[in-house]
Swiss-Prot record:
Residues 145-228 form the Ig-like C2-type domain. Coiled coil: none annotated. It is a single-pass type I membrane protein. The lineage of its organism: Eukaryota, Metazoa, Chordata, Craniata, Vertebrata. This is Myeloid cell surface antigen CD33. GO terms for cellular component: external side of plasma membrane. Glycans are attached at N110, N160, N230. It is found in: Cell membrane. Residues 1-16 form the signal peptide. Glycosylated. Phosphorylation is involved in binding to PTPN6 and PTPN11. InterPro entries: Ig-like_dom, Ig-like_dom_sf, Ig-like_fold, Ig_sub, Ig_V-set, Immunoglobulin_dom, SIGLEC. It comes from Mus musculus. Disulfide bonds join C36-C169, C41-C100, C163-C212. Residues 18-240 are extracellular. The chain crosses the membrane at residues 241-267.
Length: 403
């Protein structure tokens, strides 16, 4: 038969509790968000023979109600924990063995605060170590991923680029890797703390930026690292590129030259064949000299030695065709008209078809006759009217004399 303990013994035991209940743990712990931290802890409590139940422990946040609020971590499987810390805060130690170590993963900024440990051993031991509280500080994640490039990036040759976060917590939620670049067309594979990208660079990728993003979903934070690609070319590739560039430039220049020639030809065809009006009708003196020279050429006694232009007029009066006249008067189209008969042309004051007979030779001389309306005359060539400046006619008739 067990007798109840005297009341004064129970009171004396309660006074000695503070001396026997002790907790050894760091006062302050700092961790970056998304990472993990291990808080070592040792707990001591009195050994009472009458308490036969198992020892359980819990970590609670400062200011909570012991009877209404749940702990952030506990070793009691029957007790619920807070949803905000469920799966992230874990009581690793066994309070039965005086170990109250706490493990925190996927740390979040709202985890910052004060925490205390509580031990329970039914039916008599229930103690909260509020005098030895833990201060937890969660700061922003300052670390960035590492991008490793093996050797040199050569254009046209695949390379494996590795993005890693060796400082990440293995016990935490695996991070998510993603690559960003205008040159990416390849696939990537990843492990717990790294991602390998199979990348085949091209010459145009030189100088572009490649970014690796790492997202820690457990904490809702993302970090990144950006590098600039340095793509090299082999000598053979360089020669090929130079040849291709030169070939393209040559083709473009050739096309441009052909276009210019075409435009020049079209411009010359449509341009009215004129000589600058510095002689002829606007110069009465030279016009009179030309008329006098022309009349002298018509004289039977005229000599070519005295008047060189007479050979042209006599050629006009003797030849059955006026092709020689066309060769002189149309310097821009003389090549085109060199072998063409007069039958394809129409003059407003002379009308003929085919070769000129001897009875029509005198009509050829009318072309150079000084008339009242000599300025201007119109010459239809291929159904197009070309205005003849009087100087042109003068030059036709007495070209050698005026030159």
């Amino acid at each position: 038969m067990l007798w109840p303990l005297p009341l004064f013994l129970l009171c004396a035991g309660s006074l000695a509790q503070d001396l026997e209940f002790q907790l050894v743990a760091p006062e302050s712990v700092t961790v970056e968000e998304g990472l993990c931290v291990h808080v070592p802890c040792s707990v001591f409590y009195p050994s009472i023979k009458l308490t036969l139940g198992p020892v359980t422990g819990s970590w609670l946040r400062k200011g909570v109600s012991l009877h209404e609020d749940s702990p952030v971590a506990t070793s009691d499987p029957r007790q619920l924990v807070q949803k905000a810390t469920q799966g992230r805060f874990q009581l690793l130690g066994d309070p039965q063995k005086h170990d109250c170590s706490l493990f925190i993963r996927d740390a979040q900024k709202n985890d910052t605060g004060m925490y205390f440990f509580r031990v329970v051993r039914e039916p008599f031991v229930r103690y909260s170590y509020k005098k030895s509280q833990l201060s937890l500080h969660v700061t922003s994640l300052s670390r960035t991923p590492d991008i490793i490039i093996p050797g040199t990036l050569e254009a046209g040759y695949p390379s494996n680029l590795t993005c890693s976060v060796p400082w990440a917590c293995e016990q935490g939620t695996p991070p998510t890797f993603s690559w960003m670049s205008t040159a990416l067309t390849s696939l990537s594979s990843r492990t717990t703390d790294s991602s390998v990208l199979t990348f085949t660079p091209q010459p145009q990728d030189h100088g572009t930026k490649l970014t690796c993003l790492v997202t820690f979903s457990g904490a809702g934070v993302t970090v990144e690292r950006t590098i600039q690609l340095n793509v090299t070319r082999k000598s053979g590739q360089m020669r090929e590129l130079v040849l291709v560039a030169v070939g393209e430039a040559t083709v473009k220049l050739l096309i441009l030259g052909l276009c210019l020639v075409f435009l020049i030809v079209m411009f010359c065809r449509r341009k009215t064949t004129k000589l600058s009006v510095h002689m002829g009708c606007e110069n009465p003196i030279k016009r009179q000299e030309a008329i006098t020279s022309y009349n002298h050429c018509l004289s039977p006694t005229a000599s070519d030695a005295v008047t060189p232009g007479c050979s042209i007029h006599r050629l006009i009066s003797r030849t059955p065709r006026c092709t020689a006249i066309l060769r002189i008067q149309d310097p821009y189209r003389r090549t085109h008209l060199r072998n063409r008969a007069v039958s394809t042309l129409r003059f407003p004051w002379i009308s003929w078809e085919g070769s000129l007979r001897s009875t029509q030779r005198s009509k050829c001389t009318k072309l150079c006759s000084p008339v009242k309306n000599l300025c201007p005359l119109w010459l239809p060539v291929d159904n197009s009217c070309i205005p003849l400046i009087p100087e042109w006619v003068m030059l036709l008739c007495v070209s050698l004399t005026l030159s």
